[in-house]
A protein has these predicted regions:
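Active-site recognition of the HExxH zinc-binding catalytic motif
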Residues: 89-101, 608-609
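M16 family metallopeptidases and their MPP-like homologs
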Residues: 74-84, 110-158, 165-176, 203-228, ...
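His/Glu-based metal-binding/catalytic segments typifying zinc-dependent metallopeptidases
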Residues: 69-71, 78-80, 191, 195-199, ...
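Non-catalytic, conformational "gating/processing" segments within enzyme and secreted inhibitor domains
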Residues: 187, 239-271, 754-789
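Non-catalytic terminal extensions that flank enzyme cores
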Residues: 24-78, 292
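Short, positively charged and aromatic/hydrophobic N-terminal segments
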Residues: 2-22, 26-28
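Hydrophobic, small-residue-rich alpha-helical packing segments that form membrane-like cores
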Residues: 180-181, 185-195, 203-238, 242-248, ...
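Long, compositionally biased intrinsically disordered regions
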Residues: 461, 474-561, 702, 711, ...
Length: 1002
């Protein structure tokens, strides 16, 4: 997995829930001072995260070790290495993939996948950054956690990469020639992954900005790998990289949570670190010398041959902001990013939008590299607007310095960031993982300063005190206006660039093949065959058995509890979830959409996108956003869908318009007041603002389709037969995009009618008799809720309205959507219940088996795709999908082979147990207070009973091989639906266009 800065994209195991620290004893910190093999360098009380921290160094090997102990049982271990790339061959990235493909003590071909299949991990992955490579694991089970640590330490220090070159050729790159007279090509998992990454214009922009700002240090090179350069990497260079950087002296070892730290340190020393002597590793990240003047560079990205170049250019303004070792500056620019750029109506965003420069103004502050970068980006602009773009930005910045930044915006930014810090809810990721990654923002560059960013309470206090003092204005002057270490980067479209480069590559490979002797060509064929044979060889049983596996008996049969208490407050139905939340109330106000017609659904999607970022009767939209973030932890809207699992054959579902907020109990009154303001007082006749939002929405939808093409394609294919999937597609998918694009392109004719329709929808939807509330809090958080709910209900529409039943018609289309990408997202879907096959808990095991065995081996390992997934749910929907896949027809053939694979499914009892444990691992993720409430409400709305969950769990824990073989009929039913949607390269889709009923471009 490749990552730029702090943005992490997970393709494999990604549905992980974080664990939240509540109250507990942090005084039982380990007595590591008695361990003579380590030197204690720092010992700190980390009050901000309620933990104790110790910085150590292993005396013999020079390994840096950081311990963070609290009572969080979601334990985290990671080992990281500083890995500055010297070129763009992607060797750090290829190494990250390769070391997880077998090691001295765990010689199986893919221990990583074996762990995914058979451990209770709450996180398991690895990430390549521009200057480091990180290998983190997490688990709540002590035995499992130790197993994960063992496999990962062995992988990074004793990988099998030295035994043969097949892992390098599989994960990195290799020549592929199936027969002597065939076409020569490149293949490799990383090679294909980066072809996908380089197909996105946002990806191109991120990379060229980094390379432009730092021409003289490691950031000038592409650590993930440039597909044009990856094939220059030799096997010996690959091995040299490991010899150089993968040594304990260049490592950063991190342990977090509730565990016996002394025991872990002894184990690390005795099993691994004591076998190494200290070594000088030249991996220092050098500072880039500042420029004498701002640089200007222009690059190209590819669009489809029939796509317009008009309003398709990216303009970016980028400045380097000190270093990440400046504690206050590191956080201060997060606040400035909010106040100047990211918040709706922020001055930079508003000025550029008003000037007509770009349809979507974005920005970022990347403090995940040594020298952070502040960026302003105008998407869907014209290259000719570059000079005006720079002028508008700098005029706004000068005005902010002269007249002062909006103090409420600064306070809102500080409160927003501090609330997130104190809440410590990282959604799908363990808290300890995210702390560990943030620690690396300073520790990597100064081995004596690991804690400066996770111990942030003093920093927030400092930043609050600086509001109104001129501090922030001085930062703008120094780091943005007077700073010459910057770059104006233009990324402009080129029609058919992908096809042109592919033709050049094919010509180059053909000429290379022609230059070879017959013997050399035959060797390429033999090497291709040898790699395929290696990939197809069954694992040696003895090697697999070296990977530790828990027993079924280690798994509890108990299910996680529900927290649903029905009540009425102010005559409004409330489902209350009594959970300790550290004084935060999580409110979700839900409005039924069953009275909205199918023809109105796109407008509902637009309404959801508009509310909260448009003026209201009492606030300009920028003031509204600041008012919310000064007083609460945030308010947002969404459209949700709940399938009734007791009426599957009737395809019954309930859709809702939801507005969610979170705040300290003392601020809940304000939260409800702001919700009422958004729902009842928004100025939906502000057509100028609606036009801006539609342009932004169109841009963001395209970005989503490009970055998450697998989910988009799966949803679209499901929508051919599923009313609930069709609903989602009409409100957030491809169908919705088409409607948004049409209205945006014909806005002058559409605007008045659209405004009227949006107002009418607010009257139809936002009614007290159409409302229910989900509320998560401790019992004391119920106090005062009734009058708050009554006040909200009182402001809603009480007039009678005409409701129209939502009748959705589905139609099978089998579409291919052409893009300028070099890879495909191939989705095949169907409903097995429609074909007479019932749901069983064993289908959750099937998802693990297919995603990490049959599909993994055939689509990723042999096919070179980056990812592959499958899913089967309670309402009968099943899908197979690939991610960043160089193939199309071949992948569909792999899907067709699932039935035969399952009919002949035979594994050992040990492997069967492993699949079951991996399945339970996905189900038993630790939950934050917020996610406990959300899970309870989702089960309530979907009519899923505790008995259903218990039955499903028992079916999983008691499953045998014959239960998996019986699922062949499920796969057969899904494939029989013959529902196909592919998003991918125009050449590949045109090549296989006979597969589709319709081929079109976005």
């Amino acid at each position: 997995m490749y990552s730029k800065g702090l943005t992490v994209y997970f393709v494999e195991k990604c549905d992980i829930i974080a664990s939240v620290y509540e109250k507990g004893d942090i005084g039982k910190f380990m007595s590591v001072k008695d361990l003579t093999t380590y030197e204690v360098l720092k010992d700190e009380d980390l009050k901000g995260i309620k933990a104790k921290g110790k910085l150590l160094k292993h005396k013999k090997s020079g390994a840096r070790v950081l311990l963070v102990e609290n009572d969080d049982n979601n334990k985290v271990f990671s080992i990281a290495f500083r890995t500055p790339p010297s070129d763009s061959t992607g060797v750090p990235h290829i190494m990250e993939h390769s070391v997880l493909c077998g090691s001295k003590n765990f010689p199986a071909k893919d221990p990583f996948v074996e762990l995914v299949k058979g451990s209770l991990n709450t996180f398991l992955n690895a990430m390549t950054y521009p200057d480091k490579t990180v290998y983190p694991v997490a688990s709540c089970n002590d035995k499992d956690f130790q197993n994960l640590m063992h496999v990962y330490m062995d992988a990074v220090l004793y990988p099998n990469i030295y035994n043969h070159d097949k892992t390098f050729r599989q994960e990195g790159w290799s020549y592929k020639l199936d027969e002597k007279d065939g076409e020569l090509s490149y293949n490799g998992v990383v090679y294909n992954e980066m072809k996908g990454a380089f197909s996105s214009p946002e990806g191109v922009l991120d990379r060229v900005v980094l390379n432009t700002l730092f021409p003289d240090n490691c950031y000038a090179n592409e650590s993930g790998g440039d597909p044009e350069v990856i094939p220059q990497l030799t096997y010996e260079q690959f091995l040299d990289f490991h010899r150089t950087y993968y040594h304990p002296s260049n490592s950063y070892i991190y342990l977090y949570g509730d565990m016996d730290m002394e025991e872990k340190l002894r184990w690390l020393d005795e099993e691994y670190l004591c076998h190494y002597d200290k070594k000088d590793v030249n991996s220092e990240i050098h500072l880039q010398k500042p420029f004498d003047e701002v640089q200007e560079k222009t690059f190209e990205y590819s669009i489809a041959s029939d796509e317009s170049t008009e309003e398709n250019t990216f303009l970016s303004y980028n400045k380097v902001i000190g270093t990440t070792l400046d504690r206050e500056l590191y956080q201060a620019f997060e606040i400035l990013d909010y106040a100047l750029l990211s918040a709706p109506g922020a001055p930079l965003k508003k000025a550029l939008t008003d000037a007509g420069i770009g349809k979507d103004i974005m920005g970022s502050y990347d403090n995940g590299v040594y020298q952070p970068i502040f960026s302003v980006v105008a998407k869907n602009a014209e290259e000719s607007q570059k000079d005006e773009f720079v002028k508008v930005i700098e005029d706004v910045l000068r005005d902010q310095v002269k007249n002062g930044i909006n103090q409420k915006a600064l306070l809102a930014g500080i409160n927003y960031n501090e609330f997130r810090y104190r809440e410590a809810d990282f959604g799908n990721y363990p808290k300890g993982l995210m702390y560990g990654l943030q620690i690396m923002d300073s520790w990597l560059y100064d081995e004596n300063q690991p804690f400066i960013h996770i111990e942030a309470l003093e920093t927030f206090a400092f930043l609050k005190n600086k509001v109104g003092t001129g501090y922030y204005e001085e930062l703008i002057q120094k780091y943005l206006l007077d700073n010459t270490h910057g770059a104006i980067v233009v990324v402009r479209p080129e029609q058919g660039r992908t096809a042109r480069l592919d033709a050049q590559l094919q010509d180059k490979l053909q000429k290379y093949k022609e230059s070879l002797s017959n013997a050399e060509v035959e060797k390429l064929v033999a090497d291709t065959k040898a790699l395929e044979e290696y990939q197809s060889e069954p694992e040696v049983i003895e090697n697999l058995e070296k990977i530790p596996v828990l027993r079924r008996e280690d798994i509890s049969r108990e299910i996680a509890p529900f927290f649903n208490e029905e009540m009425k407050l102010a005559d409004v139905p409330v489902v209350y979830h009594e959970i300790e939340t550290n004084g935060i109330g999580y409110v979700n106000v839900m409005f039924d959409l069953s009275g909205v017609s199918a023809e109105e659904l796109a407008d509902v999607g637009i309404l959801q996108s508009v509310l909260g970022i448009i003026d209201t009767e009492n606030y300009e939209y920028s003031e509204l956003f600041n008012e919310i973030n000064v007083n609460t932890g945030g308010i947002g809207t969404s459209l949700e869908l709940y399938n009734n699992v007791t009426r599957v054959k009737e395809k019954e579902f309930k859709a809702t318009f939801e507005i969610k907020g979170k705040a300290l109990y003392s601020q809940l009154e304000k939260t409800f007041a702001m919700m009422a303001e958004i729902l009842t007082a928004s100025k939906l006749d502000d057509t100028k603002r609606i036009r801006e939002i539609l342009a932004m929405l169109k841009s963001r939808l395209i970005m989503k389709f490009q970055s998450s093409g697998h989910t988009t394609a799966a949803l679209r294919a499901l929508s051919y037969a599923s009313p609930s999937a069709k609903f989602k597609d009409m409100t957030s998918g491809i169908d919705f995009y088409k409607r948004v694009a049409y209205i945006e392109e014909h806005f002058d004719e559409e605007k008045e009618a659209l405004s009227q329709r949006l107002y009418a929808l607010t009257k139809k939807i936002f009614r007290p008799d159409n409302m229910m509330i989900s509320y998560t809090a401790a019992r004391e958080g119920l106090e005062g809720m009734e009058p708050r709910i009554a006040e909200l209900a009182g402001r809603l529409n009480h007039e009678k309205v005409t409701e129209t039943p939502c009748i959705i018609h589905c139609e099978k289309k089998n579409e291919g959507f052409k893009t300028a990408s070099k890879v495909q997202y191939v989705a095949r879907t169907g409903n097995f219940i429609d074909r007479g096959v019932e749901y069983t808990g064993a289908l959750q095991i099937l998802k693990v088996i297919l995603s990490y065995d049959y599909l993994w081996q055939n689509i990723r390992v042999k096919g070179g795709a980056y990812g592959c997934m499958s899913s089967f749910n309670r309402i009968g929907e099943g899908y197979f999908v690939s991610y960043r896949d160089p193939n199309l027809k071949r992948t569909i053939d792999v899907y067709e082979g699932v039935v035969d694979y399952l009919e002949n499914f035979t594994v050992s009892d040990r492997d069967m147990t492993k699949y079951i444990i991996g399945t339970i691992s996905n189900m038993d993720q630790p939950m934050t207070p917020a996610t406990k409430g959300e899970r309870s409400m989702n089960l309530y709305m979907n009519k899923v009973s505790a008995e259903m969950i218990k039955k499903e769990r028992a079916q999983i824990l008691d499953a045998a091989q014959e239960d998996i073989r019986a699922l062949a009929k499920v796969a057969k039913a899904v494939l029989a639906a013959d529902q196909l949607c592919v998003i991918g390269g125009e050449e590949k889709i045109e090549e296989d266009k006979e597969l589709f009923g319709d081929v079109t471009s976005f």
